[in-house]
């Protein structure tokens, strides 16, 4: 049975989608069967793996409101499978309020196909609302990207409070899968200090490999490619492959 991991941080700009996209590609490259569920209305993970949001047969919004099946919605790419999103998903937060088991719509959908994958990543929106609650109820665990910059720990207290609430009331299996340090700048003492502080807060959960600041990571999405393909020898690509190996050891 595959593991379902929600990639979540309510603070924007921390490398959440970049991490979801590139770990999907790196694990696929390593021979794992991976699905990336784009559950963010911005749909950047969808375009980041080369899909045109204008030409989708179905999308995850239609899945959670019951108008399409997961099997008919998944798109297959050379970088991994994608359950794509569009801006339509923004309306789901309202529509889900009127359906049965609103917090479990994504979980019910993913349970039907989880045996087909080694890992299912969910790219969550950068907020703590109904779409994110759906993601946390669907997941076995969470992966938290944390940028190595000032205010890095801002919002993590709220996220951990939400995690405890969801675990207690909605999804008792939910755990922390890992913490990924992103935007690390080895030229500054500050990045090192932030990394040390995060490791102190999450003992045993922070990946040894950190994701550096790297221009190729910023360029790759505009080409619809993961950095592991856009520039496979770049520091960003090497770092995500190394982090993927750490994940493989935990599977």
Each predicted region: which residue ranges?
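P-loop NTP-binding core
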Residues: 1-251
């Amino acid at each position: 049975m595959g593991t379902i991991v929600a990639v979540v941080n309510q603070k924007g700009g921390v490398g959440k989608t970049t991490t979801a996209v590139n770990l999907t590609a790196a694990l696929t490259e390593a021979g794992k069967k991976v699905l990336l569920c784009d559950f963010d209305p911005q749909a950047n993970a969808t375009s980041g793996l080369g899909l045109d949001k204008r030409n989708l047969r179905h999308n995850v919004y239609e899945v959670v409101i019951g108008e399409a099946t997961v099997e008919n919605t998944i798109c297959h790419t050379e970088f991994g499978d994608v359950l794509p999103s569009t801006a339509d998903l923004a309306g789901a937060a309202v529509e889900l309020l009127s359906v049965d088991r609103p917090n479990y719509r994504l979980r019910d959908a993913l349970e039907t196909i989880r045996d087909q994958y080694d890992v299912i990543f969910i790219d969550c929106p950068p907020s703590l609302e109904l779409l994110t609650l759906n993601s946390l109820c669907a997941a076995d665990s969470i992966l938290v990207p944390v940028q190595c910059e000032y205010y890095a720990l801002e919002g993590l207290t709220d996220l951990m409070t939400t995690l405890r609430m969801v675990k207690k009331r909605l999804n008792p299996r939910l755990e922390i899968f890992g913490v990924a340090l992103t935007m690390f700048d080895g030229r500054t003492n500050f990045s090192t200090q932030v990394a040390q502080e995060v490791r102190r807060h999450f003992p045993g959960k922070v990946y040894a490999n950190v994701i550096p600041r790297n221009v190729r990571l910023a360029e790759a999405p505009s080409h619809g490619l993961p950095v592991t393909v856009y520039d496979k020898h770049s520091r960003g690509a090497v770092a995500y492959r190394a982090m993927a190996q750490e994940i493989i050891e935990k599977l």
